[in-house]
Amino acid sequence: MALVTLQVSSLDVGSNITPVQDDEKSRRKRMQRRQSFVMVKGAALLLQDEGEPIDTREPLSSSGPNEQQIHLQSMLRLLREEDTLTLAVRLEPVRSCLTRYLLVVSSTGKSNVEETLLLGVDFPHDGSLCCTIGTVLPIWSNTQVFLDGDGGFTVTSGMDIRTFKPISVQTMWSLLQMLHKACESALSNNVISSSLYSGLIYYQSNRSSPQVCLNAWTASPDIESARRDPATPEREETERIIKLKLRDILRESDLENITSKEVRSALEQHTLCALQDYKEFIDNEMIIILAQMDRPSEIFPYLYLGSEWNASNLEELQKNKVSHILNVTREIDNFFPELFMYLNIRVLDEENTNLMQYWKETHAFITTARHQGSRVLVHCKMGVSRSASTVIAYAMKEYEWTLETAIRHVKERRSIVQPNAGFMRQLQTYQGILGASKQRHSYLWDPSSAPSLPLMSPPPKNFSSPTTSPLTPRLQKMNLRTLMRSISEMEAADTISEEKESTVVLEETTLKQNFNVLESSSNNLQVTPKRNEHVLSKEQIIQEEKKVMELEKGPEWVVKNNVLEEMKETEERELPNFELPMSLNQSRERDQETIKESSVITQGSSSLDEVFESSTPTRSPEMASYACQKIQYFEQHSEGYSKVCFVDNLQSVSEEEKVTLVSKQLQTDEHGERKARITRQQNVIDTHEEL
């Protein structure tokens, strides 16, 4: 471990800079600022912030700066003035890129929020004094870090996935700590993925690493099929000639009888050179060409569905005018990143893979290629499950098709399509999401957008209903707000009904107690007939009723109304005194005795004083009508009286029914007495008018 202080300036320290303007002086002053780093093997950690006063005396070194210090000084030159290099970590070499660093760069944005970027830097060789930017990866709130094992980890930022592998455990631990701190800061500040960092565009526009290094930064550890690194110009030319001749030979030969050695001999005759060193290359190319003979399937005029072999066939891609390639694999590399626009969906062909979360981006990617007038190739390993599911989802959304229609359309053009069970469930869910999205403007959710119903003219007067069954009227859709209100009312009604049930139970308990008291007291009561209540005999009442009906001038309903009131009076006068007849025959005998007594009493003339002193009714038309109706009423309701009379004796009647009958009678006592007094006064007035 060592402490290193570096001057953030150009390497031309010995050149004389003449300040001409004030801004030039300030710029030179800024460039003379220094930064201190803690240097360990393969890593450099910032020790103090720039702008902090430090000792300007540099330590003397007879050997000069080492390789790591030279690399650090070169990397500082790539940064903007407002950016700070927080950590620099050396990574393991990949392919021909031997010297690679990952830089953690931070700065303060316009909103005073700390912005963090990851820069991948390439050096042509160890002693090089210059470096280039190979990749740029921003740290957002949705950025995640996953450990891959063997000291490597993967960083996902939006749709970008990058894999890094530091050269030691110590450097890996330092880098993971710094990444965790940056991710937590972005999450707390809610730095969304759509926000643009001030330095993001600047560094992306200055990516200048060789294509081999660019491919190494985008490589995935799970890649099984990768593109070959370019070789020497002479070997590249020979391989290009082999590809062209090999395709022609395989197209013209009988593939069932020709061998690999015969193919190589035919190539040597065409190239006029020995191809002993190219045997492995020739075998690989033969397999690729045989696989590429299965052309990609044209699902739509602008969309092809194929396999990894179709994605590696440059001639076929250019012939089909493909400009965009959608790679829905984790194990297949991008073969021509410098020629085509790529979108990588790094997923595996497993049932638990969440592929639906990427369908919004894939739809936008395919739509962009279509609007540009070009074509897009969607591929996975074999063009059967992952890429096919993505194309089916695109067709469902773009053309508003059902899942069944989209699958049938794709299978008609590529019969081997077969999404796995997990992707099929996601497609069914996606169909429901699209269906719900279509209804977002429906008046079920927005009542103001409901179409006005046409007014129907009334049917003609002479319209007669047809003999056949009428058409069922169309049910109107219920408004969502009305539906929710009705649900709330139903809940309130349930609460009220529960309260009523509890009240009824309480009332029944109280009535049972009252009934027990009444039952004990009713046994001591003696039934005494009222001597002042008299009625006419049945024969006299019928005769007088006929005469009265002939002489009546008023409406019949008035007379009946009076009769009903008198009937209620008689009933209510008998019940409070518990004058309950034991049977219907006894009740009739008592009525007959009363009629006989009344006939004897009414033979004499009654004066006005006698009328007021006695409540005996006279033979007026109203009273005669009342008496007649009274007899009819007793005959019709005799069954009801019998039930009241035998309340204590009938064993079949339950205790609850007894309580109900007695409670009803008690409630009508007071009301009946008031009505009886009013009716007597009315009868007296009528008698006075007749006299």
Curated annotation (Swiss-Prot):
Family annotation (InterPro entries): DEK_C (IPR014876), Dual-sp_phosphatase_cat-dom (IPR000340), Phosphatase_SSH-like (IPR043587), Prot-tyrosine_phosphatase-like (IPR029021), SSH-N (IPR043588), Tyr_Pase_AS (IPR016130), Tyr_Pase_dom (IPR000387), TYR_PHOSPHATASE_DUAL_dom (IPR020422)
Biased composition (Basic and acidic residues): 587-596
Active site, per annotation: 380
Spans annotated as Disordered: 585-620
Location of the Tyrosine-protein phosphatase domain: 295-436
Molecular function GO labels: actin binding; phosphoprotein phosphatase activity; protein serine/threonine phosphatase activity; protein tyrosine phosphatase activity
Keyword Cytoplasm recorded: yes
Primary location class: cytoplasm
Residue ranges the record marks as coiled coil: 532-580
Keyword set, alphabetical order: Actin-binding, Coiled coil, Cytoplasm, Cytoskeleton, Hydrolase, Protein phosphatase
Location within or outside the cell: Cytoplasm, Cytoskeleton; Cleavage furrow; Midbody
Superkingdom field: Eukaryota
Gene3D superfamilies: Homeodomain-like (1.10.10.60), Protein tyrosine phosphatase superfamily (3.90.190.10)
GO CC terms: cleavage furrow; cytoplasm; cytoskeleton; midbody
Polar residues compositional bias, start-end: 597-619
Annotated ranges, domain DEK-C: 236-291
Subunit structure: Interacts with actin and this stimulates phosphatase activity.
Note from the entry: Tyrosine phosphatase activity has not been demonstrated for this protein to date.
Similarity annotation: Belongs to the protein-tyrosine phosphatase family.
UniProt-recorded name of the protein: Protein phosphatase Slingshot homolog
Gene (name only): ssh
